[in-house]
Every structure is written in C-alpha cells, then in structure tokens.
C-alpha cells in the first residue's frame, strides 16, 4: 500500500533590528495547545492542497494564519528547504524579511467537538498568538524539527 506523506508549506518571517535578527513564530490555537509552549510554536504554515504549488500554499497559509500576505509574492521568498517533523510530516519553508505587528493577528478558525464526547461544537483560531523572538528564544519555542530551518536562515543571513 502506498503511504502518503503529509506535506505543509510555510514562511519564516524575519526582521533585523539594529544588529539583531528576530523571527516571527505562531502558537497553534485550540484546547490541545493551550498549555503547551516550548516546542509548540511554528512558522506560519499549513497543508498543501492537491495540485497547489508549494510556494503558493506558503503564501496562502501566511494569510490564513496571521491575516495578511504582507504584500509578499513568490519572487520575495528565499528558499530554506524542507524538514521532516516527528509526525512524519514534511514542511517546506521559505523566508521573507517583513515586519508584522502581532497585535494585528487575525487567524482563520476551525471547528471541533469540545469538550470531547460533549456533542458541542466550538470554533477555535488556527493560531492564538504570534510573537517575535531572538534566535536563542526561537530555538527554545519552535517545533524541534523546524529549528533546522532557523539555522538555515541565520546561516544564509550571515553569508549575505
């Protein structure tokens, strides 16, 4: 039987403040993630749809998760490659230099039964918050597999 690998695409936003680089990470919404912090944060990303270009998915997911594409197009994106998360999901990622005010976060929502077996459907945001982190703090907060994407970004910026 052919195994289908889940594939996501996302964008690691970064900004440079004087000599320091910061990256924007998002925290997933919903009750499962409510009390999780270190290792729970992520680049804004989501599932690639059938027939969708991977970079187009990354831009769409940025808008769905933070509420804006920030004027980005595929031409603005710097490829960081892909990583495989513990779940087996492959995450393709790009980087882009843009500023974003986390207070402007407007995420799409999803519906799930909560509490379990209650028969009650509730809406939750895909992302409940976004924050800028310096590289050391980002490394503590980000999904462990995605830390490699952060390292690739920093290496690329050091070489530029």
Question: How should each PLM-predicted stretch be described?
Answer:
Residues 17-20, 30-33, 49-50, 87-88, ...:
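Short, charged/polar surface micro-motifs in flexible loops or helix N-caps
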Residues 43-78, 94, 134:
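The catalytic Nudix box helix
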Residues 1-43, 94:
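N-terminal strand-loop-strand
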Residues 120-136:
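Alpha-helix-centered segments that form part of catalytic cores
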Residues 35, 51, 141:
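Residues that scaffold the ATP/ADP-binding catalytic core of kinase and kinase-like folds
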Residues 40-44, 50, 86, 96, ...:
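Functional cleft and adjacent loop/helix regions within the main domain
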Residues 131, 135-160:
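Charged phosphate-binding loop/patch that engages nucleotide di/tri-phosphates or the phosphate backbone
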Residues 81-119, 131, 153:
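Active-site-adjacent beta-strand/loop module that shapes the phosphate/pyrophosphate-binding cleft
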